[in-house]
Regions:
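Short N-terminal strand-loop motif that marks the start
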Residues: 1-69, 314
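C-terminal hydrophobic helical "lid"/dimerization subdomain
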Residues: 2, 270-315
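Short, surface-exposed secondary-structure boundary micro-motifs
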Residues: 38-39, 80-82, 98-99, 160, ...
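A glycine-/small-residue-rich N-terminal strand-loop-strand element
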Residues: 50, 72-99
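NAD(P)H dinucleotide-binding glycine-rich loop of Rossmann-like/cofactor-binding domains
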Residues: 63, 86, 96-159
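Mid-domain Rossmann-like dinucleotide-binding core that forms the NAD(H)/NADP(H) cofactor-binding site
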Residues: 130-201
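A short acidic, Gly/Pro-enriched loop at the edge of an enzyme's catalytic core
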Residues: 209-216
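Glycine-rich phosphate-binding loop and adjacent beta-alpha segment
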Residues: 220-282, 315
Length: 315
C-alpha cells in the first residue's frame, strides 16, 4: 500500500470545502515517526482554521498546497527514519502534533515529531486518546501553567460540558480546588459527576450565584463572558481566556491577572495527562466517533457548540 486517505481543502470556507483525497503515504524523516492513525480529535480551532482565521491559517496557503486539518492524533508507530526517537515500530503513541503549523492529522498516516508524542496508557479507549491532546493540554496549561491553581482555591470554568471544560473540571478537582462550572441544564448531572457544582447559564446569572468569590476563572465563551467574569473574581484574582485577547487590559486595569492562552505541545505535560488517564483520574468524554468521510458532519456538530466532550474521527 503506497497511498492513504486524507481529508483536505484547497480553499478556506465552510465545511463543504472539506473533501477526501488519496495521496502518497509520507516517508519518515529524522526526528519524526510515521503513525498509522487510529483516532483524530476534532477541535474548534480546526473550524477556525478551515475558515482562514487564526494563527494556523497564517502559516498555510491551501490554494498553493492542500491543507489537511487536525492536530490531535493517536495511533501506532509503523516506521522511523532509523535515528533514536524513543519509539519503535509497534508502539502506541498520541500527542498534539506541530501546532500551530500544519500537522495533517485527518489522515490514515501522520508524520509526527517524536518529541511531541508519548506512549499511550494501557486500557484507555482509542477514541479517548485521539480526543485528548489539544483539549487536555489547553486545560492543563490554563489551570497550572498560567493561572497557577492551588489546592483549596475556587475556580469557575465556563462551558463545563465542552471539550476543554469537562477536562478542566477533572484536573481542577484532582488538584483539590473547589470547582464551579456553567452548563445547560441537561448537562448538569454530567458536570456534577466530573467534580463541579453546575450553574445554568440560561436561567441563572453566575455573577449573582457566586458573588466575588473566585480565585480563578477559565473563559472560553467570548468577550462578554470575560467581562462579566471579572465581577466574580476576588481582588488580585486570575482569569485565563481562550478567545480574543482584546479585553485583557480592562481586567489588568482593575488589578486582576489576565492572560490569553494559545496551547502549545509539551511532552512532559502529555506524560502527566497520560498518567492521569491510565489511573482513570482523567476521562475524555467522546460524544461521537465518525469516519473520516464524515469530516464535514463532524465540523458541523462542533460548530453547534452543543456537543458534550469531544467529536473524534477514525479512518
Amino acid at each position: 500500500m503506497t497511498t492513504m486517505r486524507q481529508i483536505q481543502l484547497t480553499e478556506w470556507g465552510d465545511e463543504s470545502v472539506l473533501h477526501e483525497a488519496n495521496v502518497p503515504i509520507p516517508s519518515p524523516v529524522r526526528g519524526h515517526v510515521l503513525i498509522k492513525t487510529v483516532a483524530a480529535g476534532v477541535n474548534p480551532i480546526d473550524l477556525t482554521t478551515r475558515k482562514g482565521l487564526g494563527p494556523a491559517a497564517q502559516l498555510a496557503d491551501p490554494s498553493y498546497k492542500p491543507f489537511v486539518p487536525g492536530w490531535d492524533v493517536a495511533g501506532t508507530v509503523v516506521a522511523t527514519a532509523g535515528d533514536y526517537t524513543g519509539f519503535k515500530v509497534g508502539d502506541g503513541v498520541f500527542g498534539l502534533v506541530a501546532f500551530p503549523s500544519p500537522a495533517g492529522a485527518y489522515a490514515e498516516y501522520v508524520l509526527a515529531p517524536a518529541h511531541q508524542l508519548v506512549k499511550v496508557p494501557a486500557d484507555v479507549p482509542c477514541a479517548q486518546l485521539g480526543g485528548a491532546p489539544l483539549t487536555a493540554l489547553t486545560a492543563y496549561q490554563a489551570l497550572f501553567e498560567v493561572a497557577r491553581l492551588k489546592e483549596g482555591e475556587r475556580v469557575l470554568i465556563h462551558s463545563g460540558a465542552g471539550g476543554v471544560g469537562h477536562l478542566a473540571i477533572q484536573l481542577a478537582a484532582q488538584a483539590g480546588a473547589q470547582v464551579f462550572a456553567t452548563a445547560s441544564a441537561p448537562n448538569h448531572e454530567f458536570v456534577r459527576s466530573l467534580g463541579a457544582q453546575p450553574i445554568d447559564y440560561r436561567t441563572e446569572d453566575f455573577r449573582a450565584v457566586l458573588g466575588q468569590t473566585m480565585d480563578v476563572v477559565l473563559n472560553s465563551t467570548g468577550q462578554q463572558t470575560f467581562l462579566d467574569s471579572l465581577e466574580v473574581l476576588v481582588p488580585g484574582g486570575r482569569i485565563v481566556t481562550l478567545t480574543s485577547p482584546d479585553p485583557l487590559d480592562v481586567a489588568r486595569e482593575r488589578g486582576f491577572e489576565a492572560q490569553w492562552l494559545t496551547v502549545h505541545p509539551d511532552r512532559m505535560q502529555m506524560q502527566e495527562i497520560a498518567r492521569l488517564m491510565s489511573l482513570g483520574l482523567l476521562k475524555v468524554h467522546v460524544d461521537q466517533v465518525l469516519d473520516f468521510s464524515q469530516a464535514a458532519q463532524a465540523h458541523a456538530l462542533v460548530a453547534t457548540g452543543r456537543t458534550r466532550g469531544k467529536i473524534v474521527l477514525a479512518p
